[in-house]
Amino acid sequence: MGEALRGLKRTIMCGEPRENNIGEKVTVMGWVQRKRNLGGLIFVDLRDRTGIMQIVFGEEINKEAFEKSDNVKSEYCIAVTGEIVKRQSPNNDMETGAVELKGEDIKILSESETPPIYIKEGLDASENVRLKYRYLDLRRPDMQKIFMIRHKTCKVVRDFLDENGFLEMETPILTKSTPEGARDYLVPSRNYKGMFYALPQSPQIFKQLLMVSGYDKYFQITKCFRDEDLRANRQPEFTQIDMELSFVEEDDVIDLNEKLLAKVFKEVAGIDVKLPIERMPYKIAMEKYGSDKPDLRFGMEINDLTEAVKNSEFKVFKGAIEAGGSVRAIKAENCATMGRKQIDKLQDFVKTYKAKGLAWIAYKEDEIKSPIAKFLTEEEMKAILEKMDAKVGDLILIVGDKNNVVFESLGALRLHLAKELDIINKDEFRFVWITEFPLLAYNEEEGRYQAEHHPFTAIMDEDIDLLDTDPGKVRAKAYDIVLNGEELGGGSIRIHDSKLQEKMFSVLGFTKEKAWERFGFLLEAFKFGPPPHGGLAYGLDRMIMFLAGTENIKDVITFPKNQNAFCPLTEAPNVVDENQLEELGIKKIEKED
């Protein structure tokens, strides 16, 4: 049984003592990292979240403490009181390496079994074991650094927004299900049997209602929930830095958030963000990079070859152009020597993005090699090489198809090749705002338009008339902030006119009755003088990944789920008692074989 503190107070953290503390009598508390018994002396490295302190016990220092210290093992939780002295053999690899603590008294607060994982940096244990024993995983110094970064980030964000007149306000967690997009997590109601709350996918509607309420600058750091299939770096519950402002336009929201990003990245990670951040319309991003989340740390931009091959008799190119598509290409420098097997793998790669194939031209020193050369005239080949600014040693990779297939396949191929060729500067941070998103996307399966972002996004002023005549061409007052090919956050100016909002619901295929059934409370609120407003939300978890330099979202969440949305630690979700289900009016139906 562990000893009680009995009034003993910690006076200094393990990672704090320096030479200016020599001579001080202190008490430290923490976990035993390791113990070394050298006969007449016992050395213990004691760890807490600030670092490690070496403690020396000896018969000449205190015989009772010396004998007691011999009983401690790794991960025992102990308290030690003694004097800070100069270390005879300094350890320059430790921040406290110039000093050590002479152990005059020791309390063993609790013992530890042999841990199933080593408490050290750079752990190579399996993810499942780490998640099952997450409380031990979180003791590791590299994990503790991450959560100190997370804390500091939240503090910097709160301080900045407070200084800029924002109010931190909370919105409901139990709310109404308005299915449009990802699936909701549903919570059954005991009082209203057969009815359900939904956990919020975002605070979107409530923060708009706060604008109607006159709280013109709102923010919160809040949990959101989406019941979707978990891809890499997705979690069913995640944290947003959410904000909304009244009486603003796009530039106002963007300018404020550039200052916020610059402050966060500088103060938390020492990274300078060059302002103003580049802005790029969605159309340009797709045409040049094949993605609305372009990674700008390398070139390999997509070029349009449609004009150069518009008269080509090559069936793939001709068919794509006649069908209203295009022919486009990327250039892989110094890759003309790539073997046929490697190119075949690239062809298989683009086919996963529905491309029918991948044409290629290798610009070698003594020849231009290509399986499509026989289908191209000399003028067409020359035009392609000029358009691509090709030089000896370059490999040109071409896709001809519908535009969306061309963009998606070449955009993915561009990223794939950059990683394979190792041409991405991992120390660079390239921000870009993507603007002028399409407002709508047509769902061919359902035969209707769907909102690209959400149904509350405002329309660019010059495109309002297109909502009646050509909805697919309407652009939104929406903006995403992208960093190194990852979406860091996104937002928009919102519709604040009830008639326009009703019209938007109509374009999305909602009857008036259905729109009022789902969103009547918002439409009703818009009858009472709503201000122009807009906002933005960041994925805090993804932001911390960049600031902490990790590529795994589970590293930045204290108790994450695995790829199957299961918690190995608590074994949630779990079966509940029948009486709990009965109270909720729920009956389980067994699946038939």
UniProtKB/Swiss-Prot annotation:
Pfam families: GAD, tRNA-synt_2, tRNA_anti-codon. The keyword Cytoplasm applies. GO terms for molecular function: aspartate-tRNA ligase activity; ATP binding; catalytic activity, acting on a protein; nucleic acid binding; transferase activity. Homodimer. GO terms for cellular component: cytoplasm. The gene is aspS. It is an enzyme of class 6 (ligase). Belongs to the class-II aminoacyl-tRNA synthetase family. Type 1 subfamily. Keywords: Aminoacyl-tRNA synthetase, ATP-binding, Cytoplasm, Ligase, Nucleotide-binding, Protein biosynthesis. It comes from Clostridium botulinum (strain 657 / Type Ba4). Its EC number is 6.1.1.12. Gene3D superfamilies: Bira Bifunctional Protein, Domain 2, GAD-like domain, Nucleic acid-binding proteins. Residues 204-207 are annotated as: Aspartate. This is Aspartate--tRNA ligase. InterPro entries: Aa-tRNA-synt_II (IPR004364), aa-tRNA-synth_II (IPR006195), aa-tRNA-synth_II/BPL/LPL (IPR045864), Asp-tRNA-ligase_1 (IPR004524), Asp-tRNA-ligase_1_N (IPR047089), Asp/Asn-tRNA-synth_IIb (IPR002312), AspRS_core (IPR047090), GAD-like_sf (IPR004115). It is found in: Cytoplasm. ATP binds at R226, D227, E228, Q235, E487, G539, L540, D541, R542. Its main location: cytoplasm. Catalyzes the attachment of L-aspartate to tRNA(Asp) in a two-step reaction: L-aspartate is first activated by ATP to form Asp-AMP and then transferred to the acceptor end of tRNA(Asp). It catalyses: tRNA(Asp) + L-aspartate + ATP = L-aspartyl-tRNA(Asp) + AMP + diphosphate. It comes from the Bacteria. One of its GO terms (biological process) is aspartyl-tRNA aminoacylation. L-aspartate binds at E180, R226, H453, R494.
